């Protein structure tokens, strides 16, 4: 997830989906904010472009094409537009497409940067020009360990020029490498531009980790090389085509423009934070920040899942499969607490173990999450009628959850059953008996299993 900033050529952070590291020595897991390859410094006639020396500032999100566009005028010298893409087709890569229209003859300098968080360990920052026969591939790269060494993260980046063959060294501008420090790795070029002649180029980067790759360093290089040597229109058109496909699942509201924008923004974020066939889920903040540690809560099953189930069943399947892929950890948790079946964590990460901080009673007592999972599973089958999925994933999950609730319930003297000592949907009311939401969702889960 690339989070833009309201400053020229700046982004706040890049969040790495499903990549976790401990937040502190005694803390729980937290989603990683990775190296930032999406910042540039651009100079015109020796002066750096900043928010203080531009006018006609405008930023907009094109939800249809998933493109974040910024435009402005730098003094009386140039009109500049750039567009940030978190590429849907190259899911580990981003692409910043830049257009400069000189209002007079000018000289530009563009510096692309890889900035490594200070908490990362032993960054190795390099610049190399790879070569295959006559094709040359300039690669700026940093490789480092995450905060406590759980993951190796590799980030690569390079410039792309649209009017030339970027793989030909004799055609592209001279590149200058500046390793400011182990944590700041820069690559620059300069170019003289003539009045009213558009100049177009891009900065593209990719970031990979050992969560997904044995060799994240080399994989990040491959993605960048692909972007370097693929014509821009082909690359961006494929990205747009995939977003066109996503928007086949739309909600149209007539006569209320603001409500239409609000609903589409919500859908945009659901689509941007998820992917069909990934078997990953969505945290409350998606990929916009490290809030909630990037963990998966009941928010997914109860609020995010229903619209996706109706509008994009490939993504909906990924969300439920995320849970079934972690059913063994849920079964272990049930055993550890003296129950049968599967008991899901209140906060889940890549492992499927409980990831809630120990001080939060929700992690120990908010058990309705297990029923919420069952409700989502049965609803997926009811809508899709996918019997193969029901046999391999759906019913095994419903049975394990039913077994859990049977073992979790306590028989009363009058023949009724109670579920005691829980945190319900109201997280500020801990250690209550027969919470309405918990009991109701458990009853629903048991009915769905029969």
Task: Go through the PLM ranges and name each one.
Residues 265-272, 322-329, 396-408, 444, ...:
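Alpha-helical scaffold segments in carbohydrate-active enzymes
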Residues 233-385:
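Substrate-binding groove/exosite segments of carbohydrate-active enzymes
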Residues 95-99, 139-152, 188, 283, ...:
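Short, hydrophobic/aromatic alpha-helical segments in well-folded domains
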Residues 81-82, 111-112, 317-322, 335-336, ...:
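Beta-strand segments within the central parallel beta-sheet cores of soluble alpha/beta enzyme folds
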Residues 108, 211-218, 250-254, 310, ...:
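Inter-helical turn/loop segments and adjacent helix faces that build the functional surface
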Residues 115, 206-208, 309-310, 351, ...:
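Short, glycine-/Ser/Thr-/acidic-enriched flexible segments
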Residues 288-296, 342-392, 400-450:
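The feature captures the catalytic groove of carbohydrate-active enzymes
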Residues 1-292:
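Acidic/polar, glycine-enriched structural segments that form the non-catalytic walls/loops
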């Amino acid at each position: 997830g690339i989070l833009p900033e309201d400053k020229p050529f700046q982004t706040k952070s890049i969040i790495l989906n499903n990549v976790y590291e401990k937040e502190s020595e005694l803390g729980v897991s937290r989603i990683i904010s990775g190296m930032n390859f999406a910042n540039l410094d651009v100079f015109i006639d020796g002066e750096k472009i900043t928010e203080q020396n531009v006018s006609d500032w405008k930023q907009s999100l094109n939800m249809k094409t998933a493109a974040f566009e910024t435009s402005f005028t730098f003094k009386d010298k140039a009109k500049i537009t750039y567009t940030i893409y978190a590429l849907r087709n190259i899911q580990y890569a981003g692409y910043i497409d830049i257009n400069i229209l000189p209002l007079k003859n000018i000289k530009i300098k563009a510096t692309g940067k890889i900035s490594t968080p200070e908490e990362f360990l032993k960054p190795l920052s390099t610049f190399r020009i790879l070569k295959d026969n006559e094709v040359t591939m300039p690669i700026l790269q940093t490789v480092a360990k995450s905060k406590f060494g759980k993951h190796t993260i590799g980030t690569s980046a390079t410039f792309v020029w649209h009017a030339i063959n970027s793989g030909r060294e004799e055609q592209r501008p001279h590149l200058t490498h500046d390793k400011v420090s182990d944590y700041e790795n820069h690559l620059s070029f300069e170019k003289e531009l003539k009045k009213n002649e558009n100049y177009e180029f891009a900065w593209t980067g990719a970031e990979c980790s050992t969560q997904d790759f044995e060799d994240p360093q080399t994989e990040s290089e491959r993605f960048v090389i692909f972007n370097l040597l693929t014509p821009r229109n082909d690359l961006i058109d494929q990205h747009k085509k995939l977003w066109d496909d996503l928007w086949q699942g739309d909600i149209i509201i007539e006569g209320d423009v603001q409500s239409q924008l609000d609903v589409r923004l919500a859908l945009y974020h659901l689509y941007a934070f998820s992917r069909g066939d990934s078997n990953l889920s969505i945290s409350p903040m998606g990929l916009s920040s490290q809030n909630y540690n990037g963990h998966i809560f009941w928010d997914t099953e109860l609020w995010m899942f229903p619209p996706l189930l109706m509008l994009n069943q490939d993504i909906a399947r990924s969300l439920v499969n995320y849970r079934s892929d972690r059913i063994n950890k849920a079964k272990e948790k049930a055993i550890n607490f003296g129950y049968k079946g599967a008991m899901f964590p209140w906060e889940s990460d890549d492992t499927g173990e409980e990831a809630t901080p120990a001080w939060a009673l929700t992690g120990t007592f908010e058990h309705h999450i297990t029923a919420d999972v069952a409700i989502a599973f049965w609803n997926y089958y009811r809508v899709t009628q996918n019997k193969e999925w029901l046999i391999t994933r759906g019913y095994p999950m419903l049975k394990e959850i039913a077994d859990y609730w049977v073992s979790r319930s306590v028989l009363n003297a009058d023949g009724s059953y109670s579920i005691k000592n829980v945190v319900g949907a109201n997280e500020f009311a801990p250690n209550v008996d027969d919470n309405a939401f918990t009991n109701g969702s458990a009853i629903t889960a048991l009915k769905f299993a029969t």
